[in-house]
Amino acid sequence: MEREVQRVRQAFLSGRSRPLRFRLQQLEALRRMVQEREKDILAAIAADLCKSELNAYSQEVITVLGEIDFMLENLPEWVTAKPVKKNLLTMMDEAYIQPQPLGVVLIIGAWNYPFVLIIQPLIGAIAAGNAVIIKPSELSENTAKIVAKLLPQYLDQDLYVVINGGVEETTELLKQRFDHIFYTGNTAVGKIVMEAAAKHLTPVTLELGGKSPCYIDKDCDLDIVCRRITWGKYMNCGQTCIAPDYILCEASLQSQIVWKIKETVKEFYGENIKESPDYERIINLRHFKRILSLLEGQKIALGGETDEATRYIAPTVLTDVDPKTKVMQEEIFGPVLPIVPVKNVDEATDFINEREKPLALYVFSHNHKLIKRMIDETSSGGVTGNDVIMHFTLNSFPFGGVGSSGMGAYHGKHSFDTFSHQRPCLLKSLKREGANKLRYPPNSQSKVDWGKFFLLRRFNKEKLGLLVLTFLGIVAAVLVNAGYY
């Protein structure tokens, strides 16, 4: 493993990943891979998650293609050095910030969206000029295999490497020194990744999870609310990091919510949900049994049917859920939706704030002041008002968690920034040494006073131009008054 990481590092040190033209070529090659081998990619995703190819395309491939196009369109601007404002002491110098690649990046993917969750950060790492080692999740083995097969056929084989394996291989990888580690997964493993990274002082981006709350105000259209929640909760069989984990609402709304979700489930998946091509399965037997254990002692108002042989769990709703029970102590990551009754928005806000910061917050209400109040009074990785999950689709947003739901962010420009070092550069002249005497010993109060004058006043090009014009105006006025014109 050490030899492989060193091989990738030597490829990075060769400098060929840095030129803009090379980065654009690699991104175009990646897009070509997705387009030309679409059927193979979709088949692998479908095999891992019992997902229809239409769902695999809409949930993963579209996002990847959109991200590549966004990078190709904007990358020439992002890589350009940006001038900064200057003070009087540096007004004659060149001062700018130059984005610089970090080096060798490790991307550790997750199994629930096994393609997009490794390729989307890879896009950002390539755009920033890095070399990358990719470790797909071993639980989504078909996608891991197809990625390992296809990437070397389209991308630089020395700079972008896929390493497959399980816990042992990941543990060995984490012993190596990287310049950034990007991990998507659960909080427990996130802590292990961060601990390993700390030994090398390696910065990390941790895309974790948590229990994303969904508050439903009594002032809303429950038909629309329940359609949107049903879509977001049961998509991918509930195995989505930003799926609504539980509902907070007044007790009087519970029966209406259950009924409307029931009707929507029938509309989305038909009378026989098990036969629907749009309803996936739990990834493996261990997660299947874990989710079943969360149902023990609960009041099942909808669903609850299971089939261990196919790892099927029906869309399920629990009512009158006690916050102290097991289902409210861990991220569900499955098609089980608890409803916790609260008296009002104040109690809902307190409930959220008493727990770990979630990856997402969802609030439904016709009252936008109430939505913005909950935004102001809570903390979460992201927020969508009157819908779920949709903030993920906007690549001008940073996507990431806060607190135990993660650290750092990516998507669009935020991916480029995550994998770049913003390097400040000041270019001075070896002339005008007289002005530098102010900073040389011996010191004096006069030098300190002049230093304050020079350092505490900042200049940009516009202000410098105005200063020059003002100075020329004063000179012209003096000359006129002196009778030269």
Swiss-Prot record:
Organismal lineage: Eukaryota, Metazoa, Chordata, Craniata, Vertebrata
InterPro entries: Ald_DH/histidinol_DH, Ald_DH_C, Ald_DH_CS_CYS, Ald_DH_CS_GLU, Ald_DH_N, Aldehyde_DH_dom, Aldehyde_DH_NAD(P)
Motif Prevents secretion from ER mapped to chain: 481-484
Membrane topology designation: Single-pass membrane protein
The protein, known as: Aldehyde dehydrogenase family 3 member A2
Catalysed reactions, semicolon-separated: an aldehyde + NAD(+) + H2O = a carboxylate + NADH + 2 H(+); a fatty aldehyde + NAD(+) + H2O = a fatty acid + NADH + 2 H(+); (2E)-hexadecenal + NAD(+) + H2O = (E)-hexadec-2-enoate + NADH + 2 H(+); hexadecanoate + NADH + 2 H(+) = hexadecanal + NAD(+) + H2O
Description of how the protein assembles with itself and partners: Homodimer.
Molecular-function GO term, any one: medium-chain fatty aldehyde dehydrogenase (NAD+) activity
Positions where Phosphoserine occurs in the chain: 293
GO biological process terms, semicolon-separated: fatty acid metabolic process; hexadecanal metabolic process
EC number of this enzyme: 1.2.1.3, 1.2.1.94
Residues at the catalytic site: 207, 241
Name of the gene this protein is made from: ALDH3A2
Chain's role: Catalyzes the oxidation of medium and long-chain aliphatic aldehydes to fatty acids. Active on a variety of saturated and unsaturated aliphatic aldehydes between 6 and 24 carbons in length. Responsible for conversion of the sphingosine 1-phosphate (S1P) degradation product hexadecenal to hexadecenoic acid.
One cellular-component annotation, GO: endoplasmic reticulum membrane
Family designation: Belongs to the aldehyde dehydrogenase family.
Residues at which NAD(+) binds: 185-190
Organism from which the protein derives: Macaca fascicularis
Main location: membrane
